[in-house]
Amino acid sequence: MKQQMTKKTFFIAFVVSLGGFLFGFDAGIISGVMSYVGPQFDLNDAQTGWVVSSSSFAAMFAMLVAGRLSDRIGRKKILLAVAFLYALSAITSAYAISYETLFLSRMVGGLAFGAALILAPTYIAEISTAENRGKLVSIQQLNIVLGFFAAFLSNYYFNQFNISGSEAFNDENVWRWMLGVEFFPAILYFGLLFFVPESPRWLYTQNQSDSAKDILKKIHGATQAEVEIQSIEKNIEESEISKAVSIRELFAPALRFIMIVGITLGILQQVT
């Protein structure tokens, strides 16, 4: 019998995937910022490139450690840290007084979205049923696109305020508004995460099975919760067995082509 998606499951997935919205917003907003920041800070081409790409550079390192760190202290704690870093990056970027402070502030945001891109899909997969997992995880991708759209729309309106001659949105200030407005969805994200439970699967790995069962019952109901509990227990057992598998297995003939295709698609997505 097909399991229907509950409103609670959708709400949790939507809240967690707001990190994707902030990623898209952060990545898109910089396109409007640089036409003002460049002349104000007298940036050369290399510095301009670093301001734009610094967040992606920092995200690379966050991706390497976010998964392992969340295994130790929990998915929810890392997601809360992600929301906090987004808010901190927005405020410090808006008040940047030099190339260096803007560069470092952007890197803080990069740490946030690097961790979010790893953890949000993982968390959503861990709280959803097999029937609805694909649909719920895809909310993350939808929110990334919506974030880009919101960023371009925000840039448009701030540019219109600048053109209108408003003193508050002059050339020296308008880019600060562009960057600072991200603080509001970041704080909303932070607040909503307190209504999100810890990952049941992570709780199981920490020998907190009773808490995990309670969460699953609240999300899916008692009947489906039993199915999910069995699935989690089986998955954890299989994970323990697979720990002995070396990373060199990725280069085995059976997986090599799949890995190359996956990496190529990721590179092409970023290049375009």
Regions of interest found by a model, annotated:
Residues 1-272:
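Transmembrane-helix signature of 12-pass secondary carriers
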